[in-house]
Amino acid sequence: MAFPQRKRTPSFSSSVLDSVYRSIDESDGLQSDLKGSINENVSSSSSSPSPNKKDDKLTTLRRAIMDEEHWLYARSSTTTTNSSDSSSFSSSEAESYRTKRRLRKLAEQGKRSGDERQRTKRTVMDNDSRLFSKSDDDKKPKAVKIIEELKRSKQPVSPGARLTSFLNSIFQSNAKKVKLCSVGKTTDVKSSSSKSCFSRTRNKTDNNNNNCKKLERSIRFYPVRVTIDGDCRDYAQKHITRVRKPIPEFTAKKSVKEEIKTNDHHTEFTCITRNIGLKDFVRSNKYEGKEEEEDAWSHSSSDLFELDSYRIGMGRYLKELPVYETTDFKTNQAIARSLLL
């Protein structure tokens, strides 16, 4: 880690090191002094022997040196521990600060995510409540509403509506019907192909002769002349099977109802057509009477132009339009004489 630069002032560790170095230098000086004194003592001992005093001095000096060295070592260890403690403390503080910041960021993010979740839940609930509050009519499109209204509205009872309903029912019944191949009681069948003309379901044949009890209907033509008596029998393995299905009850009821409806429609249609025919007949008679009257008036007015006028000139008779007073025989004797001639 890069620590910030400190001011240029003597720190505690630098002062301790200076003192240690000084003490070492002083101990070196003391040792030199001790050596000199020892040498002097040796020389003096040679001159005047005093071994007890010399030993005491040496022991004291040695103790003093050992004490100083021990003190210096203890001080240096304390300084190193203090520096390591301070560095570890600073690093731990930095790490704790970073962890605190991370925890704060995580807490803020969690709060934000929780708020966003709550907002989304609220919006979803509001949308659901709006959808449930809306009625079914609001949800349906306009076209569906219009169709339902048209279905609900009652059709007017009129001959045109009856005609249209009758025609629609006829077309629907014709579409539902299936074209079948009718086979008479005695028929001659000639065909070069063995394909089936009509097959309602899958064709199945058994060895039994009671094929009429099956729920299948199939007509098959072969290139052999076959006469059918109405019974479902095999003729030299070239047969025509005709099976009738049992009509269920509900289909029978439906067919009866449909027949009743068709009969009602037919009667209504006949009545309507009769009324329409009578109206047309009356109208045609009226028009014919008017035309005859107009023809009569035209004949009476055209009689003037059909009169013959005779004029004699150059030995020939000419037919022209009548001139005033030329048709009177008394006034015009020439015309009368010519007519007599």
UniProtKB/Swiss-Prot annotation:
GO cellular component, as recorded: plasma membrane
Localisation: Cell membrane
Name the UniProt record assigns to this protein: Protein BIG GRAIN 1-like C
Tree of life domain: Eukaryota
Broad class of the protein's primary localization: membrane
Keyword hit for Nuclease: no
Low complexity bias (residue ranges): 76-92
